[in-house]
């Protein structure tokens, strides 16, 4: 039987607390190490998902039309949005949580600030990890928000 990755950290916290309350400190070590490892993985995942590099592997998003509806709804609220591209990113850390890259393009005369990209990222469906990038004519002017 395989342990569900999403349950690993909460279960480790419960067992650590249980053994600690019983003063069985030698049994606590295993769960303390598991909690430390989970915290390290979360930190590495945040770093990995916070930027898009040239060698990163992008895959089809794999979402059904019904699963895309919240994405469409979130993006339709932003005036001047011309196009958007969504891809799933292949990640090394926390693979159970899908990581996406969303590239948005606005009308030519629209100024795109970091706060606007952050608003777009915040309006996306809950429970997803998505890097939002602005596509501009000049490569060096691209901005990104996690």
Predicted regions and their residues:
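Acidic-aromatic/histidine active-site loop/patch
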Residues: 140
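Conserved small/polar residues in nucleotide/adenosyl-binding loops
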Residues: 145
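Alpha-helical adaptor scaffolds
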Residues: 1-3
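Surface-exposed beta-loop interaction hotspot
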Residues: 9-12, 17-71
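A contiguous, surface-oriented mixed alpha/beta subdomain in the mid-to-C-terminal portion of proteins
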Residues: 43-47, 53-135
């Amino acid at each position: 039987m395989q342990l569900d990755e999403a349950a690993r950290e909460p279960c480790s916290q419960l067992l650590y607390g249980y053994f600690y309350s019983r003063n069985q400190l030698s049994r606590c070590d295993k769960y303390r190490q598991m909690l430390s490892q989970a915290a390290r993985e979360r930190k590495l995942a945040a770093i990995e998902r916070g930027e898009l590099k040239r060698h990163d592997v992008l895959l089809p998003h794999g979402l059904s039309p019904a699963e895309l509806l919240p994405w469409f709804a979130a993006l339709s609220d932003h005036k001047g949005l011309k196009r958007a591209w969504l891809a799933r990113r292949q990640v090394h850390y926390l693979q159970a949580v899908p990581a996406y890259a969303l590239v948005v393009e606005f009308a030519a005369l629209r100024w795109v600030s970091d706060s606007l990209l952050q608003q777009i990222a915040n309006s996306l469906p809950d429970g997803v990890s998505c890097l939002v990038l602005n596509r501009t004519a000049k490569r060096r002017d691209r901005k990104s928000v996690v």
